């Protein structure tokens, strides 16, 4: 259940106009179950409204969702672009990948810190970037193409050795990893797990979070040494599977010597 958020306050007190209640109900249901699982019947029941109210204020479920995303994401993305522009002006020599990644985090973190709506907002971001609905994916691509392109170019300048296609793949996985964390956890629980019981400031907290994702962008990608390790593990897995199959059928083959690298307790190099 969503806790510590501002979405249910209107519903609990019965105050607020119908349009606001519909938006709040939509946000809550979207965070909890995603776009496809959310029906107008669910929205109106939670908002204490009727279908005629949705048609009057928005016209459709799609238009209602578009309004919610615009209200929540447009200010965030404006702040991200402003921060990126300011940093590029201060550092014309170039920015590192971790710094660019930080510019995606910091405005969102500010909105979640010291704000009763913050945990809900962070989970909304996680759901938006991980929801598989074609409608959500299409909306993000159509409405936020400029900011996506702006940050992609910033990452490309920070990582000039990466082919653009590979950079796109790495960014996709990095954002998916972040989305999974944000969509599935209470923000305070996530912070607690990162600070490991220590008293740390915001900069230290964000640095740790960014350090978890930065290797997705910067780690070597399928080097010959990495491929060799995986090939040896695959060979060992096939050998183990054959041994298990032989044991199940009552036919035990002769014992084969384990690879030297495995006896020594290390990965092959």
Sequence positions of predicted segments:
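Short, leucine-enriched amphipathic alpha-helices that occur as contiguous helical runs
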Residues: 15, 19-27
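Amphipathic alpha-helical segments used for helix-helix packing
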Residues: 99-103, 116-145, 186-187
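Conserved phosphoryl-transfer catalytic core
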Residues: 63, 72-87
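Short Lys/Arg-rich basic patches
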Residues: 10-12
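C-terminal peripheral helix-coil segments that are non-catalytic and often amphipathic
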Residues: 2-5, 142-269
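Short alpha-helical scaffolding segments that buttress acidic/His motifs in well-ordered protein cores
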Residues: 104-108, 122-129, 174, 178, ...
């Amino acid at each position: 259940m969503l806790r510590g958020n501002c979405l249910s306050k209107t519903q609990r007190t019965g105050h607020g106009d119908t349009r606001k209640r519909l938006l709040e109900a939509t946000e809550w249901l979207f965070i909890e179950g995603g776009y496809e699982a959310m029906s107008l019947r669910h929205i109106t029941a939670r908002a204490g409204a009727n279908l005629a109210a949705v048609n009057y204020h928005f016209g459709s479920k799609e238009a209602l969702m578009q309004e919610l995303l615009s209200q929540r994401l447009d200010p965030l993305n404006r702040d991200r672009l402003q921060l990126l522009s300011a940093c590029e002006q201060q550092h014309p020599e170039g920015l590192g990948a971790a710094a660019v990644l930080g510019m995606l985090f910091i405005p969102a973190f500010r909105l979640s810190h010291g704000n009763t709506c913050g945990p809900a907002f962070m989970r909304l971001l996680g759901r938006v970037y991980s929801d598989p609905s074609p409608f959500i994916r299409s909306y993000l691509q159509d409405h936020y193409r400029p900011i996506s392109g702006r940050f992609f170019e910033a990452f490309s300048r920070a990582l000039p050795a990466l082919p653009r296609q590979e950079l796109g793949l790495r960014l996709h996985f990095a954002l998916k990893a972040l989305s999974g964390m944000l969509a599935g956890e209470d923000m305070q629980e996530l912070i607690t797990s990162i600070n490991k019981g220590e008293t740390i400031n915001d900069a230290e907290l964000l640095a740790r979070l960014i350090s978890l994702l930065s290797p997705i962008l910067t780690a070597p990608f399928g080097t010959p040494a990495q491929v060799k390790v995986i090939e040896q593990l695959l060979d060992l897995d096939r050998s183990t599977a054959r041994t298990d199959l032989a044991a199940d059928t009552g036919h035990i083959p002769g014992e084969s010597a384990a690879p030297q690298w495995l006896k020594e307790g290390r990965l092959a190099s």
